[in-house]
């Protein structure tokens, strides 16, 4: 269910990288990969995405920091060229933004655009991973929850390698009690 689209159906202002990344994107003709960060339900959440976007841009990657409902803009951006996007497509989403990253991948599946990597951080009730996703990683916390976060599961026919990592599980490299839903992108 795409509840955020009902609460904020206007897709203008979905690109935040001009404000949060603190440096411009490199020339698209000079880069091959496209990395899209989908924030949680409000602009103030997922603050670390702007920082990550800026680091990737300075390293020569094309990256965009987006509001969660930026999935429509992403799909238009990736389908506007006849030959499809150059290089790899990578989606990173937090919370509601992770669900929208999955929805964007789902939209791109019938037109043959692959998502090389899908990274979900703390996504609640995730839809199944679409068939066009090649690899997926899901980092989530199972304790101190207001709503359920759980593992990603493949859609029938999906051959993606899916890694689900419970950061509260025994042996986790994360110090217990320190990480939460709001600071996971700043870590």
Residues of each region from the PLM?
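Intrinsic disorder/low-complexity detector
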Residues: 1-2, 159-167
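Helix-enriched interaction subdomains in cytosolic or periplasmic regions
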Residues: 2-10
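Active-site catalytic motif of lipid deacylating hydrolases and related acyltransferases
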Residues: 8, 19-87
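Secondary-structure boundary elements
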Residues: 13-14, 110
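C-terminal partner/receptor-binding element of secreted or periplasmic proteins
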Residues: 14-20, 144-145, 182-187
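Active-site donor-binding loop signature of nucleotide-sugar glycosyltransferases
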Residues: 40, 123, 141, 167-169
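Serine-dependent carboxylesterase/thioesterase catalytic core
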Residues: 53, 63-69, 75-158
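C-terminal catalytic histidine-bearing segment of alpha/beta-hydrolase fold enzymes
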Residues: 163-187
């Amino acid at each position: 269910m795409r509840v955020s689209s009902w609460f904020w159906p206007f897709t203008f202002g979905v690109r935040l990288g001009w404000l949060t990344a603190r440096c411009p994107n490199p020339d698209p003709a000079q880069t091959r990969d496209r990395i899209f960060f989908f924030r949680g339900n409000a602009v103030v959440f997922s603050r670390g995405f702007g920082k990550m976007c800026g680091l990737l841009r300075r390293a020569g990657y094309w990256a965009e920091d987006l509001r969660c409902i930026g999935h429509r803009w992403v799909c238009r951006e990736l389908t506007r060229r006849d030959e499809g996007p150059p290089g790899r497509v990578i989606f990173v989403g937090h919370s509601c933004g992770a669900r929208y990253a999955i929805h964007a991948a789902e939209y791109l599946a019938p037109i043959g655009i692959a998502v090389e990597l899908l990274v979900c951080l703390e996504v609640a009730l995730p839809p199944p991973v679409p068939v066009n996703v090649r690899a997926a990683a899901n980092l989530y916390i199972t304790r101190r929850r207001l709503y359920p976060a759980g593992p990603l599961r493949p859609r029938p026919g999906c051959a993606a390698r899916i890694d689900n990592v419970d950061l509260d599980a025994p042996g986790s490299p994360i110090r217990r009690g320190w990480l939460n839903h709001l600071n996971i992108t700043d870590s």
